[in-house]
Amino acid sequence: MGAVRFANNTICSEHYIPYLSQMSCVLTAALINLENGKMDVCHVGDTRLYSLRKDVFTKITSDHSIVGPKEESGQISEEEAMVHPSRNIITRSIGKEMLYDGSEFIQTHTLHLEPCTLLLCSDGLYDMVHSSQMKRILQGPIPADERVEKLIDAALEAGGKDNVTVIVIDLMK
């Protein structure tokens, strides 16, 4: 959490420079500790962390966006969220305001590790590729780097114009 607060405050300290005055970014980070079997997740914005465990594909983070809470509460479907005109309007980001504590602003989780596949991704992926297709690709019997390529290809083939950031991590016991 301290590193995220430091990054946030460093970005904020550059706002006096006119061309940097609107600078901010989103962040999802996972710190995996194999010694204690836990993973700490730190999240601000609309990048996502998913877990695929025993055929169950779960979104771990909650989007800090206009549309995210509507999708999570069931007010709109995943399909509706993918094309919603406000889908890319974020409500929290790194670099918008100075943080002195940040514990309420930054979403954190501690998860107990089990064999699973983790997917960290930007909206360039999940705005274009349905979660069921992401799950199918992640379940493929190919190395993680090839699954990354397949996910990126799926987003681009669906007409993706945004940047597509994808990280796949296989955790095995």
What are these regions (language model features)?
Residues M1-K173:
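PP2C/PPM-type serine/threonine phosphatase catalytic domain
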